[in-house]
């Protein structure tokens, strides 16, 4: 049995009882990485020397009885678009291959203050643009359940590392499903918090009105512990909300009697695999037995979500990624004839094809002749999508459906057709456009591949999302299943 088969609270108890040391936990993480990393390839950069030194320092503190934080001394993996002082941050892009940040993201400051130990930086789709982690500029991460399949994206490394037992938990980011979709594919728990619940300061921006940092874990309780530490207002992020952070772990009562669940007909219709649909219906039966009720509803504008998202996200990306020009940091071409040529050559050589595709799409949507027809109209449709959610939440506590239309697909299966790849996020994207919280929890298997159940909540009501997810988890054993590597 691995140490990481224990939950956060169990590991905390083991540390308090001196049955294991923090150094033991860090050793276990690097031992497991040495054992499976060649197959999974979740990590881009390891932080071994600093992690072992910090473990020794924290063991000394623990011996004096100084620390009681549940995350104290626990190893964590960090998606490589979250800046880490003194630890290379690449966004899985060649244009940032040598970027060494001089500051920590706010979430890193909070994790460090809580005593978590960064094991390394995790692979992703370049600049978080992708649904399979095949767009990484450096390596291909594989799904621990089937090494011929993708782990999802863009936080594929974050989900694969947790599923493979390399770390007990990790941080990812979610712009259109990039935490929930890989969590579903890898059979782990992933939460996209409400927009503004977690500071984005130090998250390398893709689409600033959509991005959110969130936790990926083995259990719902672990997820709640991690969100507890990273959530809260931040003066460095004007979009972070000054709303009190409740005790998420206390919300895990197991009691969902009288809970009203909405199930959008659009989320179980065309394009959703029958086996996935059956897994979700079986999950709803479990929740019914626990005292909840569910009814079918409609989110009528969700059919426009994909087009709306790709116009808005690409437009924001084209502006955000303008800063990568070879002048201040990162890759710079050696072939430039003049300054303008340096900009062109650096960006052409440094960005991958998917990033360039989205920059071009966004630039086109923002151009003067097309702004009203595309960008402005997409913003109006986004408002309608948000209203759909608000209308449903007037009568229901949560919305439930599948996280993804299918289980994990094979490596290379969708790379030649961007639209087919984009369709994979069709059930997660509306949540980002509405800004509401949502979690993916394991709810079954299809041919040995995990299926994810998506539970969507009201703005800043992560507590109810967690309560429902935890009740379902405790009534089933899907979260206890592990891949064999």
From Swiss-Prot:
Biological-process GO terms, alphabetical: translation
Location of the active site: 79 (charge relay system), 154 (charge relay system), 178 (acyl-ester intermediate)
Alphabetic keyword roster: ATP-binding, Ligase, Nucleotide-binding, Protein biosynthesis
Record keyword Protein biosynthesis present: yes
Entry EC number(s): 6.3.5.7
GO molecular function: ATP binding; glutaminyl-tRNA synthase (glutamine-hydrolyzing) activity
Source superkingdom: Bacteria
Keyword Flavoprotein: no
GO cellular component: glutamyl-tRNA(Gln) amidotransferase complex
SUPFAM superfamilies: Amidase signature (AS) enzymes
Reaction(s) catalysed (UniProt annotation): L-glutamyl-tRNA(Gln) + L-glutamine + ATP + H2O = L-glutaminyl-tRNA(Gln) + L-glutamate + ADP + phosphate + H(+)
Gene3D superfamilies: Amidase signature (AS) domain
HAMAP family (UniProt xref): GatA (MF_00120)
Complex formation: Heterotrimer of A, B and C subunits.
Protein family according to the UniProt entry: Belongs to the amidase family. GatA subfamily.
Function text: Allows the formation of correctly charged Gln-tRNA(Gln) through the transamidation of misacylated Glu-tRNA(Gln) in organisms which lack glutaminyl-tRNA synthetase. The reaction takes place in the presence of glutamine and ATP through an activated gamma-phospho-Glu-tRNA(Gln).
Official protein name in the record: Glutamyl-tRNA(Gln) amidotransferase subunit A
Organism name: Geobacillus thermodenitrificans (strain NG80-2)
